[in-house]
């Protein structure tokens, strides 16, 4: 796996050395939960400090205070927080990123994050306490208003964000992190209540904000109207910017979970889901005393969903012995406190008993049950860590279970006549697994791959027509599409590695492509949209499962690739015109305005940000940007690479796509069962492009310029060609002209196809390498063309493309 990339002025993250450890004395085994309890209580018994124009700087956050600090009592001989009452100002400079600058403007209407405030809650495990002047000694009662602020702080923060900050602080102490973290919540100013976090080990950004591209800092606020927090700004540390490199978040993972053995009790699905997850893991950091896990992340505050439906911990065992754990109401995770410190390569077995109302019932389907979140029902450490799985489900005899992997057991429960036990096994390492429960009908056939090898079973888990209040699903059609699309992608992208494939019906308006099993909405009409939908989810076997995305910034490698894969399949399965219509709709989606809470926003979705920003493109002022950019623009960017890897003298589709298919198959093989970054893909693309016909014709042997323009920037050019035809000797002609490239930076360049149509429905193809505002060309042809067009098939993404004969 690639370990380092540079930070261009603002978009990519890179990997460097992990943080140094402090040389503090180790915490004794019985101290961890006491430390947590003291931090969570947040009692202001640490004395007070009046200040006037006192300035405190933490990374890019500058704060000025006039008033009084009331400090928490010491924990492990250190102060971990304070409440400020008075008047103050703060300023957080926007990092050197065009997206962050535009994002801040879009969300708060300013060029920098600035505000006044009257109260502030500060929590830390770094050296913040050393920056204060001497304070009054411990003891004594704090001011009543400060005590009220402290008393309500932790519970409210956990409710709004899912973050248990006290647990994060305690973990930082017992694991001896250095540097530690810093958090401050401001309130009482013109921006109301908002928060700033600097977490050098990335734990809160990864677990609770899905920000894992190396960013250590966040500025965010809870938005009641959307029932979740909204990130105003994310940033690397000041040292990262100075070095030009930063650590990917997964460098700081404490453990690597290699196997899950899960017992799932589905015997009372109307009431609750109960399970025991036994995790086999290897420790990957020194002196680990506490391990955080995410669970139920993504559940919102709407109708108290996270409070009412979260899976609650009922017990924890480490290597067979009971162990301490913490999980608060509203928390989207848990922390396990080990009985003693463990170091690298130490194997651990951790068992967690969980129970909660985590199954959802849909009125459209009677007797079928699905997790409230298909991706958050098992505890996980880090982001998309891979493991193997043994999943045993105990359920009513009238139900059956669909899940990932191979079904290796389905038989009556010897301890209860009315129950069944069904076991699935996933022997390939994967990141996410899912299940569905209901009176499914299983429809089966086999998939035989053209490349040879043993056939694999294919199953579609369909609800009986009488169970659903929606139109019946034609199982033969779904099975045929699953079979066709799987074989097609295996032929062009490389070997399908799993021992089975299938899908389960779910009554929701989206699909999800888990390893070996798709969750499919009702779709069985022989139409382009259906072909594209099923094949998109099938393509996730390669783009997302076989090859995962390294960080949220790289998710276009999954969704954009699956989207374009579905276009290729649909053009073959139906007709080229259907694929052209899908591409047209994708291009059109970029030109529409973003949606806001009050209606249509300003500008175009294309301009919200580059595709490298992943889910952060969506906000309360830019709904729809993630779908338009990561899915659709990501697909169109891959389509342009398809053209660049082809022979410009031939139709890339008709000619067999050799260069493109070889590149994609090589990418799969190099990162099989691994995660890839955009830079990883760029390296593969560079190798394959260097000797391509387009590279030879244009004198360009690498694609760094292409990724800079289309992945890291937001440009959307318009092209227009003006040409004329002059007769030459012996019936030949000379075509000369100019291709104009508008609305993009002056250094923008792009090879653009030109197509000539001759009598007899014959065609000729060439390419113009456009650099800057315009480029001229001349081409000699053996006969006069009936028509000349600039990129009539839309290989190059543009707002508009036009051709004029002079």
Sequence positions of predicted segments:
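Bacterial N-terminal signal peptides
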Residues: 8-19
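Catalytic zinc-binding patch centered on the HExxH motif and its immediate surroundings
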Residues: 492, 497, 505-519, 524, ...
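Amphipathic alpha-helical substructures
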Residues: 285, 618-620, 625-737
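Acidic/His/Gly-enriched intrinsically disordered linker/tail segments
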Residues: 559, 563-640, 644, 671-672
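Acidic/His-enriched low-complexity segments
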Residues: 24-484, 488-496, 626-628, 671-674, ...
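Positively charged n-region of N-terminal signal peptides that target proteins for export
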Residues: 1-5
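Flexible glycine/proline-enriched surface loops and loop-helix/loop-strand junctions
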Residues: 372-377, 468-470, 547-548, 615-625, ...
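Zinc-dependent metallopeptidase catalytic helix centered on the HExxH motif
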Residues: 369, 384, 393, 518-595, ...
């Amino acid at each position: 796996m690639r370990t380092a990339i540079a930070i261009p002025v603002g978009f990519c993250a890179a990997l460097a050395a992990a943080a140094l450890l402090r040389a503090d004395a180790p915490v004794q085994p019985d101290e961890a939960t006491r430390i947590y309890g003291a931090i969570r209580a947040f009692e202001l018994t640490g004395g007070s400090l009046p200040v006037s124009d006192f300035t405190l700087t933490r990374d890019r956050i500058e704060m000025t205070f006039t008033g009084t600090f009331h400090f928490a009592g010491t924990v492990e001989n250190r102060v971990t927080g304070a409440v400020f009452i008075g008047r103050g100002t703060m300023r957080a400079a926007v990092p050197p990123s065009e997206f962050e600058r535009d994002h801040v403007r879009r969300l708060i209407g300013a060029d920098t994050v600035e505000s006044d405030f009257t109260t502030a809650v500060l929590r830390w495990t770094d050296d913040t306490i050393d920056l204060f002047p001497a304070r009054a000694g411990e003891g004594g009662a704090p001011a009543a208003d400060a005590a009220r602020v402290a008393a309500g702080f932790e519970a409210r923060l956990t409710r709004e964000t899912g973050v248990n900050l006290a647990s994060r602080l305690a973990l930082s102490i017992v694991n001896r992190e250095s540097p530690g973290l810093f958090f401050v919540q401001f309130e009482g100013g013109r921006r109301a209540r908002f928060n700033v976090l600097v977490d050098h080990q990335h734990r809160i950004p990864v677990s609770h904000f899905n920000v894992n591209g190396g960013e250590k800092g966040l500025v965010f606020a809870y938005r009641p109207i959307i029932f979740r927090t909204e990130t105003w700004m994310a940033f690397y540390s000041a040292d990262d910017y100075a070095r030009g490199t930063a650590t990917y978040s997964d460098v700081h993972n404490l453990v690597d979970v290699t196997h899950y053995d899960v017992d799932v009790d589905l015997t009372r699905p109307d009431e609750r889901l109960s399970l025991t997850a036994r995790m086999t893991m290897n420790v990957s950091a020194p002196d680990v005393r506490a391990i955080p896990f995410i669970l139920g992340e993504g559940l919102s505050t709407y109708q108290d969903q996270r409070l009412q439906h979260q899976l609650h911990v009922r017990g924890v065992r480490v290597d067979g012995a009971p162990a301490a754990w913490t999980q608060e109401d509203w928390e989207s995770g848990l922390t396990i406190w080990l009985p003693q410190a463990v170091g690298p390569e130490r194997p651990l077995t951790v068992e967690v008993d969980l129970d909660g109302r985590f199954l959802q019932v849909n009125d459209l389907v009677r007797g079928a049950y699905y997790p409230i979140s298909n991706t958050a029902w098992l505890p996980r450490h880090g982001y998309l860590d891979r493991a193997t799985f043994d999943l045993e489900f105990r359920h009513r005899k009238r139900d059956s279970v669909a899940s990932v992997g191979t079904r290796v057991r389905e038989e009556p429960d010897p301890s209860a006549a009315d129950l069944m036990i069904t076991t699935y096994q996933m022997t390939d390492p994967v990141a996410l697994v899912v299940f569905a429960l209901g009176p499914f009908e299983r429809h089966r056939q086999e998939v035989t791959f053209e490349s040879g090898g043993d056939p694999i079973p294919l199953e579609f888990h369909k609800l009986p027509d009488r169970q659903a209040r929606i139109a019946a699903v034609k199982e033969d059609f779904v099975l045929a599409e699953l079979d066709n699309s799987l074989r097609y992608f295996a032929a062009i992208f490389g070997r399908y590695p799993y021992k089975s494939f299938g899908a389960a019906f779910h009554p929701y308006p989206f699909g999800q492509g888990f390893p070996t099993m798709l969750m499919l909405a009702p779709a069985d009409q022989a139409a382009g949209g259906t072909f594209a939908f099923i094949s998109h989810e099938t393509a996730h076997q390669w783009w997302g499962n076989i090859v995962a995305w390294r960080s949220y910034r790289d998710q276009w490698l999954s969704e954009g690739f699956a989207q374009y894969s579905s276009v290729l399949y649909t053009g073959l399965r139906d007709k080229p015109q259907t694929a052209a219509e899908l591409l047209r709709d994708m291009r059109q989606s970029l030109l529409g305005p973003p949606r806001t809470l009050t209606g249509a926003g300003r500008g175009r979705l294309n301009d919200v940000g580059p595709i490298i920003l992943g889910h952060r493109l969506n906000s309360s002022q830019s709904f729809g940007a993630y779908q338009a950019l990561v899915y659709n623009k990501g697909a169109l960017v891959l389509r342009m690479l398809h053209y660049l890897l082809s022979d410009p003298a031939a139709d890339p589709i008709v000619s067999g796509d050799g260069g493109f298919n070889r590149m994609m198959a090589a990418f799969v093989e190099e990162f099989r069962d691994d995660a890839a970054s955009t830079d990883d893909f760029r390296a593969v693309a560079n190798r394959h492009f260097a000797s391509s016909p387009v590279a030879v014709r244009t004198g360009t042997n690498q694609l760094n310029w292409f990724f800079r323009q289309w992945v890291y920037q937001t440009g959307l050019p318009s092209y227009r060609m003006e040409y004329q035809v002059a007769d030459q000797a012996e019936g030949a002609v000379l075509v000369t002209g100019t291709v104009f490239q508008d609305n993009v930076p002056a250094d923008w360049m792009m090879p653009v196809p030109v197509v000539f149509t001759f009598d007899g429905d014959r065609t000729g193809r060439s390419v113009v390498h456009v650099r800057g505002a315009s480029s001229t060309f001349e081409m000699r042809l053996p006969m006069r063309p009936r028509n000349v067009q600039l990129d009539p098939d839309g290989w190059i993404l543009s707002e508009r493309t036009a051709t004029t004969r002079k």
